A protein has these predicted regions:
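Acidic/histidine-rich catalytic cores of soluble enzymes
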Residues: 1-102, 110, 119
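Flexible, acidic glycine-rich loops studded with aromatic residues
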Residues: 43, 87-186
Length: 187
């Protein structure tokens, strides 16, 4: 078998799992990512529909502290909640978990935080925080327009560690997740 044939087999059988939360954490635009994958002949085998937490970090100290305190309610020991900060100049700072981000919370160069906490996809606002739900909507709109995978999976797994005000009956929560995704695909 020649190299081109082998490469074709690999690209047919080794495919990418597009986790919407992970790409959103890195501030990647869904259409640009999918275009680049296509340009390289790489296929998406599965989309994991998931949302991260995010918030702009104001320069005003009191407003900034309110945002940081809101993130603190999501600090828990079961999962790592990596934080990727975007600076005002457009650079990225990676923190391995929330405590390291909290230690740098007064960094005035940081304009936004995104945290790897798979929050329910059906909620956009976690006042004063929000989610990366818009990225999910963008991916699903692209899937509707020109399907690029047959495998969609909702990947919220943090039900047991959500702050108390966000907890609901697990059956109801999962049903809401699936209904929300179906609504996006039907619109």
């Amino acid at each position: 078998m020649d190299e081109a044939t082998a490469a074709g087999f690999i690209k047919d059988h080794v495919q990418l799992c597009y986790d919407v939360c992970h790409f959103a954490l890195e501030y990647e635009q869904p259409a640009a990512v999918l275009d680049k994958l296509s340009a390289y002949g790489l296929k998406v085998g599965k989309v994991q529909i998931s949302a991260a937490l995010k918030a702009d970090l104001p320069t005003e100290t009191d407003k900034r502290k309110k945002i940081i305190e809101a993130f603190r309610q999501f600090e828990e020991p079961v999962y790592l909640h990596q934080v990727i900060a975007r600076t005002a100049a457009g650079g990225l700072i990676h923190y391995p978990d929330l405590p390291q981000a909290f230690a740098d919370a007064d960094n005035s160069k940081v304009a936004e935080w995104r945290s790897h906490f798979h929050v329910p996809v059906f909620l956009e606002s976690y006042d004063p925080l929000s989610s990366t739900q818009a990225d999910i909507k963008a991916v699903l709109a692209l899937q509707k327009k020109e399907p690029f995978t047959q495998h969609l999976e909702v990947e919220t797994y943090t039900w047991d560690v959500l702050p108390a005000p966000l907890k609901d009956n697990i059956d109801i929560s999962i049903s809401r997740e699936l209904q929300w995704v179906l609504q996006q695909l039907d619109d």
